Amino acid sequence: NGAKISRFNRVTDIITLPTGGYEVITEQGNIIAEHVVNAAGCFAPEVGRMVGAHVPIINLEHQYLITEDHPDIAALVKEMPVTRDSTASAYICQEGNGLLVGPYETRGSKPWAIKGMDWNFDRELFAGDLVRLMPWLERCMELVPLFEEVGVKTIINGPITHTPDDNFLVGPVAGLTNFWNMTGASIGIAQGGIGKYMAQWMVHGQTELNMASLDSRRFGPWADKKYCITRAIESYERMYASASPTENRPHGRPIRTSSLHTVMAQKDAVHFVSAGFEKPAWFKTESIREESETWTHNEAHAVVAEECAAVQNTCGITDISGTAKFRVTGPDAYAFLDRLSCNKLPTKDGRISLTLFHAENGGIMAEQTVSRINQEHFVLMGAIGCQIKDMQWLQQHVGDYQVTIEDFSEDWGGVLLTGPKAREILQTMCEDDLSNNAFAWLSCQTIQLDSAPVFAMRVSYAGELGWELHMPVWQLISIYESLMQFGQPLGLQDFGTRAFNSMRMEKMYRAYGAEFTEEISALEAGMDRFLDLSRHFIGSENLLQRQTVGLSMQLAYLVFDDQIPAECFGNEAVFANGDHSGIITGGAYGYRVEKSLAFAYLKPEHCKAGQALTVETSVGTRHCHVEVDSAYNPNNSLLRS
């Protein structure tokens, strides 16, 4: 039906209608809208506040200059290419017969309008401040000597929006229906693509592209103004910095912590952050206190090896509080989750299953570990980075189902106790029977630890005998300290996410955001044994169609044949017989098997066992082959022990 553009017409308020939709109040009259898109740029936080939405955006000043003409540039036959240089933290390109030079200062950047925007502001520019830019302009002159031969014609200084991670804010706004963000752009050349996928999202409810890194729901209320300012400045000043996999940016932290955070810090944990949540990555030793930023194995490599060895030989414990947790209750709880789940739900109380939720287009929307308490009570656990998105996915599919959904992620914490001595340690402080007959693998029950009820799940992402122990946050320190008291004489040791990731790779366990994304279905991800296509669930028709037509790519498990001290981290190109076959999703060194491991999506014909491959990595070409079984304990005897 076309569209109407109304210019010079300020929106003064937005009213959420009880019948659905919105009434947009403007200076020239009111508009009833089914959908509202917040594409207000610098004003986006103000517009968000009209409907009670938090928009984590900060404006920063950015300057660029245009030079006078230079005869050498005028004489060019082809236009000079756009150049970006990390040492100058700047972009340089041709502008007419002169240059356009835009540095991102790596210190001293200036936030703007942090107390709120003036509604009378309209494309005004600020006074230029070349003195602030001189260190980077001088480096640009070294890179392009003719730059110092010309005068400055124009200085442009204006506000640009920045988010805490410098990615767009796109997609549904949590807690609202049909209210969307399309803002937070600090780069000016991507709006066409963003518009395309935004349209798909609004019309179809999902996109063909994985939008996780842009999804505005990756930030929750925890991303307050102080955090946004600090992180946005850091992101701006590191715009052209080359980040290593071990880079650990300190600003704006900690913002989300486990109740064990201080305890872990006192034990020399090195915390990394995921969705704002602090997670111990590895623990310093007397001899190894720091790690270098590098793409190869660094000082922490030996420490992580010791942590993995403890898990394999005795027992390890790690904080798993940074997990999204949902409680689904009500008469229709089973039927509701059955409609979302691609796997059969547990039919017996106290059983656990792993499942995936799909969109209608077949993309994986969520990975959940589902624990059945009873027919009307289920507990779901998933990735902390998907907490808000997963909650909204659950809520938007409630329909006529009689269910209640509770997010208790912030209220409960937990630890994983795993290793061959896990049962012995746990049994010393627990009167419940923890034998295989009484507490089988992939089952759950409430047990008593220190006379306190703890929700115990017999699962271990590390691939050893183990229990996840979940409890209210106020219990966590006491339970952890008791476990350490009883466990240390038996060799119990802390371990972090670095070791955890290594062990999940050895077990061939996929991860959401890497092997599972909205561009992938359970079929491509090789999750056939967790997929029941005999029943109808959201996305099942698309999966049946994919199964009939055939897959264009499949997930392969790669074991490296060389001993190069470096790993894959994602997005490396994979080749078979010299032809490009696919891309790495992630990798790690397997300390228990002493091999480098990775996952990759490849052409199906290259996913057979033994297929030789090469991978282009940061340290050069590496050789590997495909395996179809996990590198560590493929028959799961240790998990079942």
Labelled PLM ranges:
Residues 2-11:
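A conserved beta-strand/loop element that lines the FAD pocket in flavoprotein oxidoreductases
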Residues 12-127, 135-143, 227-248, 252, ...:
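Flavin-dependent oxidoreductases
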Residues 15-18, 94, 172-174, 370-374, ...:
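Short, low-complexity Ser/Thr-rich regulatory SLiMs
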Residues 55-59, 80-84, 90-91, 151, ...:
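Short Gly/Pro-enriched turn/cap motifs at secondary-structure boundaries
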Residues 69-72, 95-97, 106, 173-174, ...:
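Short loop segments at secondary-structure junctions
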Residues 87, 96, 110, 120-255:
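C-terminal catalytic lobe of FAD-dependent flavoproteins
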Residues 209-210, 215-641:
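Glycine/proline-enriched, intrinsically flexible loops and inter-domain linkers
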